[in-house]
Amino acid sequence: GGICYLNLQGMNKTIYYINDDFEGFQALISLWDLFRSSQYSDIEIQLSRFFSANMSAPLGAILDLLGTKNNISLKADSNIQTILQKNGFLSYHGYPAVRDNNNTTIQYMRFKRNENAAFAEYVSNKLLNRPELPDFTPSAKKKILQVILEIFVNATYHTKTEYIYTCGQFYPNKQCIDFSIVDTGTGIRNTVNNRLGAKKHAVEAIEWALIDGNTTKEGVPGGYGLTLLQEFLHYNKGSLQIISNDGYYCNENKYKKFRVFS
């Protein structure tokens, strides 16, 4: 991970070194906490030094929430600006699109909660059909698509999220693809506690949701989808992160890490 901190000067905020790791998510949570009660303000945010392109998804969700009551201006260092123009994120903030000739971006998208078919087509065409992914059978690809679609459906089924945000990036030097799916709903903790009549903390709720057979939908099998996804990622030396409320979960090389955001 990198060093993440905010430079505060009035309503102008600079965010440095945002990786897609615990520290990076903590920095975005801190940004949200700073402004969540702001109303009718002009807020300028500067992205500096480094910004993982797939973090456009959580940042986009935060900026949309802040933008309902404030005027948001987003700026970025030139190297960051270029990639975020290529993936389409900055098109939502007044910047022209830039052609991605290297085909390393997976477009930033904002799906309405009823756009299941469009989301499935996007994941299939933009993510699962990428040549950098490992070879797998059509049936395996279909199962992975179903698992990712289930994440979308669960977010819209359980929460009042208005949009689902997605974005990804291929890194040729590391030979890896980072992909993020974000919603702005009530979170896993509230969903699980409502289902069980419990008072679990966010990390405990995430743990519960990861167990085979556990589901928050009546009469619907659950848990299996995330298990299948984790097995696929482990086999291909990938990792899975889940961030919900103040809980953080990461499974990398079958090593499971739980942490709590401040």
Where does each model-flagged region fall?
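Amphipathic alpha-helical interaction surfaces in cytosolic regulatory modules
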Residues: 17-93
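Conserved short strand/loop->alpha-helix "switch" segment adjacent to the catalytic nucleotide/phosphoryl-transfer site
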Residues: 50-53, 125-149
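Conserved ATP-binding N-box helix of the HATPase_c
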Residues: 60-65, 136-173, 226-233
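A glycine-rich helix N-cap at a beta->alpha junction
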Residues: 86-106
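Helix-loop-beta hinge of the Bergerat
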Residues: 106-136, 189, 196-212, 231
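Acidic ATP/Mg2+-coordinating residue in the GHKL
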Residues: 183
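Glycine-rich G1-box
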Residues: 186
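Flexible ATP-lid and adjacent glycine-rich G1/G2 motifs of the Bergerat
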Residues: 193-250
